[in-house]
Regions:
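C-terminal and inter-domain tail/linker signature
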Residues: 1-123
Length: 123
């Protein structure tokens, strides 16, 4: 699973939806939670092409790091040193079948309260 998470992060960092399509299941679902406080899709996004477009857009110009999210590898997005989103993936047979993107600042409290959301690799 971690290799799929790394490929997902690399494709998003490169803003390369075609590379992302290689690891997305055709019927992948992207669910985002902005909590009404930040801009995020209001409904689940279904299908690889649209999910790839949304994922790349959400993660563009962000510093991405692979970190433990809900007990498994996930992706933390930072801009200007602040956590803006946490991404968790469900993987089946080496393909991403579900993408959860938490953008809601209230739900990011754990990440924001540990080092102010700063990148832990920066010391």
């Amino acid at each position: 699973m971690e290799s799929v998470v790394r490929r997902f992060a690399a494709a998003c960092a490169a803003e390369d939806p075609e590379a992302l399509l290689e690891i997305l299941a055709a019927d992948v679902v992207l669910v985002s939670d902005g909590g009404g406080r930040v801009l995020a899709p209001l409904r689940p996004i279904r299908g690889a092409v649209e999910a790839a477009r949304i994922a790349v857009t959400l993660m563009s110009a962000a510093a991405l790091s692979i970190e433990e999210v809900n007990g498994r590898s996930g992706i933390v997005l930072r801009r200007a040193g602040r956590v803006e989103a946490v991404v968790s993936l469900e993987v089946s047979e080496s393909l991403v079948t579900r993408i959860w993107v938490v953008l809601n600042p209230d739900k990011l409290a754990h990440w924001l309260n540990h080092g102010n959301g700063a990148d832990p690799s920066r010391g």
